[in-house]
Each structure stands twice: as C-alpha cells, then as structure tokens.
A protein has these predicted regions:
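N-terminal low-complexity, intrinsically disordered patches enriched in charged
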Residues: 81-83, 306, 316
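Glycine-rich loop(s) and the adjacent beta-strand/alpha-helix scaffold that form part
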Residues: 7-10, 17-108, 118
Length: 321
C-alpha cells in the first residue's frame, strides 16, 4: 500500500526514501547501506526525476530542483512491437469452441477435479525464432502460436463464432527509440511514455515482413487440411502499403519495455557496470531499465539475472568493508 515519492539525499549520498502510505500520509524511511530501485522501465526513471536526478532542463520545467544532472534518464526506451495473423480453421476444435457455454463448464470441471483440460493451457502453445530475408546470421523475428483467435476492432477484441488460430510475431531488434519522463511533481501521476514505434525504415520493413512470414506458415502444406481462410489481415490486404496500414492500426506491445536507465560509461549512461547510479552514492537500479539495448527474446530471465548480479555486487562490497 506504499507509493514511493522521492529519494532522500545527503549531498551525493542516497540515505532514504519518502513514500505515501495507504492512508495518503507522507512518511520517510532511512537506509543503513544503500537503496536498490526495481520499479521497471517506466517508474525507475520517473522516481529519479522526482528526486532531482535527470535532465536539468526537463526538471526545471516541472519545478523540481536538480540534485544531479544525468541527461540519459528516461531516454532510450525500447519495446517489442507485435502483430497478429488470425487464421480460420476447420475439422478441428480450438479454444474458441471449448470456451463457450457447456464446453466451458466441462473444462472448468476437468480443471477443478483432475487438473486437465482447457484451463491448463498456456497462452501460447508453440514458439519459434526465425530468420527473415533481412537477418544477419541470427533470428530476427519471434513467433508464438495460440489455438484461439479473435478479431481486433475499434471497439476491442471480438470472439468469432468459428474456430481460429493465431500467430503473433515481433521484430526482435527494433531501432526506434522512445522516452519516459515525469510530467508532474505529483508522484501518483503516471509518467509520459512515448514509444516512437515504427520510427525507422528498417522497423517498418521488418514488421511488414513479419506479416508475410506468418502468412507463409499458414499456407504451408501441413495446414491445408484445416485452413479455412484468413480472418486478419484478410484477403483485401495484399500490398506492402496495405500491410503497413494494417500494422499501424493493429500492432500491440508485448510488455518488454527496457533501456530508460541504461548501463554504460558515456555521458548518456545512467548506471555503471555495477548497477550504481552514476554520480550518486548508495543507489543502484536492478530492473529492465538498465538494458543498453533490448534482448532478442523475452525479458523475464534477463531481469532475474540482473537481480542476481545486483545481489552479488552488494554482497561482495559488503564483505570487503
């Protein structure tokens, strides 16, 4: 029930944290050794800026006194953008069939008493890393397949009356860079997030190619017995321009934001190789915001690794005191 609002400093040393409790009272807590931020790529840079660490020019527009100028705070935001191809199928049952009325009740019974059936399925049944025609030696597109499908409309997702399967693809190494910045002194006001998706020619080209690769998979001989036509993008979407328009209207994030407090040794870097905030003592960051560039896959395991390394750094330094 606590909401961090500001890091407390003694000159260049982080010594505590100010937070708002569940009763909306402002409280403080002091630390004996150091503080580790693990707020993620959106809120770690926001808390730094609320505490006076960041681009001094931006902080002044918010009326926040600059404690330490770090130009890179909140910059370098990267994210995996995904696009779906939904295929109608026949002669097989999918989650679309098994999640309706009596079938859903049967599956609920199976799960409650036998831990079997529909409710034991993961979100995606199959995954693949593939090399596009633009790949430079290693896979550059990740694909997941789900035994269900729906049509995304302006009013949200619509569950069709017929069985479908879905392929979801993302370009693993996007070039586009965005930003995350505090937009108010109020710690409870969400930061301003600007992704700048599809901001480079290569990113545009790769997302169009991702749609084409997924379509080719569904047209493979192994799918011929169950293929019942494409739901999305649909037969009317054929040219690169039409595919790009479909991507711009339907692409989604995959919740892999990284890079907004990136590691490095240059003037734009926020943390050093030991995860310490540059120019500040007693403050580290251990989350996906420290990634210099997005990894070619899911970010979860890499985040766990960062947490483990942070623990090692703290333990090593503590034993040396």
């Amino acid at each position: 029930g606590a909401h961090a609002s500001r890091i407390i400093f003694d000159h260049d040393m982080a010594i505590g944290l100010e937070y708002i409790d569940k009763s909306n009272r402002l409280r403080q807590v002091r630390c004996k050794n150091e503080i580790v931020l693990s707020l993620g790529s959106y809120h770690s840079p926001q808390l730094l800026e609320l505490s006076g660490i960041g681009d001094g020019e931006h902080l002044s527009t918010l009326g926040i006194e600059t404690k330490h100028h770090l130009n890179g705070v909140g910059r370098n935001l990267q994210e995996h953008l995904t696009i779906n191809v939904v295929q109608k199928v026949k002669n097989v049952k999918t989650v679309n069939d098994e999640s309706k009325s009596l079938s859903l009740l049967k599956n609920l019974f199976k799960y409650l008493f036998f831990k079997r059936g529909l409710l034991t399925l993961p979100a995606a049944e199959v995954g693949a890393f593939v090399r596009s025609k633009y790949a430079e030696g290693r896979p550059d597109i990740q694909i997941h397949f789900a035994p269900a499908g729906g049509e995304i409309t302006e009013d949200g997702p619509v569950d069709p009356e017929f069985p479908c399967v879905t392929s979801t693809a993302c370009f693993l190494r996007p070039e586009s860079r965005g930003s995350v910045h505090a937009c108010s002194k109020d710690p409870k006001e969400p930061p301003k997030i600007k992704f700048n998706f599809l901001d480079t020619e290569r990113d545009v080209k790769m997302m169009v190619e991702a749609v084409k690769i997924q379509r080719n998979i569904f047209q493979a001989p192994g799918f011929s017995a169950i293929n019942n036509g494409e739901l999305q993008p649909g037969d009317s979407v054929r040219t690169d321009e039409e595919i790009l328009e479909f991507v711009r209207e339907n692409a989604q994030t995959v919740y892999h934001p990284v890079g907004t407090c990136r590691m490095g040794s240059d003037s734009e870097a926020v943390v050093d190789q030991f995860l310490r905030v540059r120019g500040i003592r007693g403050l580290r960051i251990a989350d996906a915001s420290v990634f210099p560039s997005i990894i070619s896959g899911n970010t979860n395991a890499a985040c766990i690794m960062i947490g483990e390394r942070c623990a090692d750094f703290i333990r090593t330094e503590a034993s040396a005191r």
